[in-house]
Amino acid sequence: LADTVPIIFSTITGNGYKLAVAAAEAVPNHVGPYNIRYITDEVIDKFDTFVISYWCNHGTADDDTIDLISRMHGKKLIVIGTLGVSVDTAHAAKVCANVIALASEHNTLLGHYLCRGSIDLKRTFARTRIPEGQKGHLSMERFEKQKQSLGHPNAEELDAARAAVAEFLSKA
C-alpha cells in the first residue's frame, strides 16, 4: 500500500467531490475518492501520501479537513480546494496561506491548488436577513457577487487541478 494514494474529499455543494474526481484521473495508483467523514486513524496509518480536497470556510479549510489534517503526522499531502470568490483576491491569498500552514505543520506539503467553487445561494441568501452589524450578515451587494460563483469549478479549473496534482505527485 506504500505507493497507493487515497483521495479524500469534503463537500457540501459537490465542489470538493468534483475536484477529487479530477485528481483521481491524475493519480495512477489511487483509491477513492472517499468522503472525509469515513476516514479513520487506521486508514491514516496505512498510507504515506494523500490527496485531500476541501472547501473554504471562514478564511481556511472546512472543519472536517482541519480535523483530518491535524490527525496526520509525517505524511505527504496534496491539498486541493474550492473558494466561493475569485482566486485572485486578498481573501484567496489568506486562505492559501492558512491552508498551507495547516498542511505543513506536521506533514510535508507536496502542493496546494485552489480554484473557484459554486456557493449554495439558498444557504447564503438566508444571511441577508441577519441585521447589518450582526455576525453572519451578508449584504445584498455581496450576495449578488456570490452569483458569479455558479458553474465553478468549470472544465478549465478541473483540467488545471489534474495538471497540478500530477505535478505535485511527481515530487513524492
Regions found by a protein language model. Give the residues of each.
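Short amphipathic alpha-helix with an adjacent loop that forms part of the alpha/beta core around
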Residues: T40-K46
